[in-house]
Amino acid sequence: MSGLDIYPHDPSSSSSTSSIDLSNEAFFSTGGLFLEPPGVSSSFFDSISSKCSDSEPLHFPGYWRNKTRLRSGKNFMFLSVSLSKDRSEQQCKKALAQNDEIPGKDNRKRSVIGGVRRRGTMNTRKHLWAGAVAAMVSKTFLAPLERLKLEYTVRGEQRNLLVVAKSIATTQGLTGFWKGNLLNVLRTAPFKAVNFCAYDTYRKQLLKIAGNQEATNFERFVAGAAAGITATVLCLPLDTIRTKLVARGGEALGGIGGAFRYMIQTEGLFSLYKGLVPSIASMALSGAVFYGVYDILKSSFLHTPEGRKRLIDMKQQGQELNALDRLELGPIRTLMYGAIAGACTEVATYPFEVVRRQLQMQMGKNKLNALAMGFNIIERGGIPALYAGLLPSLLQVLPSASISYFVYECMKIVLKVE
């Protein structure tokens, strides 16, 4: 409180001081009480006055007028308590803050939350674009090796790799090596975009839950597996259509739209999710191994004296460095670690890939499930049949993993992904 005024009133007093102007806004803005002296002890006023002694009271002249008179047969006093402007604002704000009711606070909160959400949405978009560009570059560059891989896994080629390559060049020309590449890019770009973005998102969430500053190896594997499952569920239909197009007779389906209509009309909507179970198993393992191995290698290097020195140098030079020099691992290590992670992933998941491709190629009513198909492949060709085409697949995966992770890391720097 900033001030305390006590106005005694006696009915026998003069008219100039015997009434209160009820229309005076300033008067009533201070607040007050009508008190009967017999019922109020002096200690009551002393206790209030002691709290108000640090500031001078505010006086509002002209309280007592003849215009409005309070009639009473007893003497009374009007207790007026007033606050100085500055302190009243401070005290009001303090009281409102305790109740979370500061004027404009909700608007500011909403503004801050809205800004965070917008930044988060923009960051997610940048993440997705970085992954998509990485997939487009790597897949287009390595399309010939991808085509050779499909010849072994889908058509069951047994001939030498060079013989198969010569056959494609002779019958279809050089463009034959890029057959199905557009669909492959359309399938892989969203898959990689979702995969990369989901991995970073899941890893950050696991860090928040655990309260750690750096992810453990277990958290890396879990985040990678979850990212692989997420991307598979969202993108499997495009992969199924692509497989149908490159198989024998696929040319007659009339492209992506024709293959889509054919599968829906003849086999139903769920035919687009052929091999979902082995795909999920394969991609969960693939994501866990790929991201886990890469991050373990990256973390191991960054904790070495050389790695710590590189981080310090990068921090000191800041924006003066170009995108390549701002790679934490540097260009060579980024490519090398990506290749190692890709090789480990391919060896671990290749049998699932073979089973999935064979499931997608099944026709007719008597269709095998994933487990039965696996045993069927082993019966026909033994364990090596599960790794048919592994060599061309590795030749394709090693540079693909290197390029995709390299381009992805560069795009994150260029797009300023947080």
From Swiss-Prot:
Decide whether keyword Transport is in the record: yes
Might you name a Gene Ontology BP term for this protein? transmembrane transport
Superkingdom of this entry's organism? Eukaryota
> What cystine linkages occur within this chain?
none
Question: Which terms are listed as keywords in the entry?
Answer: Membrane, Mitochondrion, Mitochondrion inner membrane, Repeat, Transmembrane, Transmembrane helix, Transport
Primary residence = mitochondrion
Q: Which cell locations does it reside in?
A: Mitochondrion inner membrane
A GO cellular component annotation here is: mitochondrial inner membrane
Name the membrane topology term: Multi-pass membrane protein
State which residue ranges cross the membrane: 127-147, 180-200, 221-241, 276-296, 335-355, 383-403
Query: Which Gene3D superfamilies has this protein been placed in?
Result: Mitochondrial carrier domain
Its family remark reads: Belongs to the mitochondrial carrier (TC 2.A.29) family.
Say what the protein does: Probable mitochondrial adenylate carrier that catalyzes the transport of ATP, ADP and AMP.
PANTHER family with a match to the protein in the record:
SOLUTE CARRIER FAMILY 25 (PTHR24089)
Protein name, as recorded: Probable mitochondrial adenine nucleotide transporter BTL2
**What's the source species for this entry?**
Arabidopsis thaliana
